[in-house]
From Swiss-Prot:
A Pfam match: Defensin_beta_2
InterPro entries, per the entry: Beta_defensin_dom (IPR025933)
Protein name per Swiss-Prot or TrEMBL: Beta-defensin 106A
Superkingdom per UniProt: Eukaryota
Subcellular location: Secreted; Membrane
């Protein structure tokens, strides 16, 4: 009985694990859901809970020296 009570208390107070891969991805897994986008990101759509789907802007790679 003590074992059951101990396991119940331990499992009851554990916080559930958050799977960030499925919760925070948007735009066909190319963007992330955030409160606001960074300078190098563009707003592509909206996520749940009034979050914004931000996708990183890739540079063209052309540099002049």
């Amino acid at each position: 009985m003590r074992t059951f009570l101990f396991l119940f208390v331990v499992l009851f107070f554990l916080t559930p694990a958050k799977n960030a891969f499925f919760d925070d991805k948007c735009d066909k897994l190319r963007g992330t859901c955030k409160n606001s986008c960074e300078k190098n990101e563009e707003l592509t759509s909206f996520c749940q809970k009034s979050l914004k789907c931000c996708r990183t802007i890739q540079t063209c790679g052309n540099t002049t020296d």
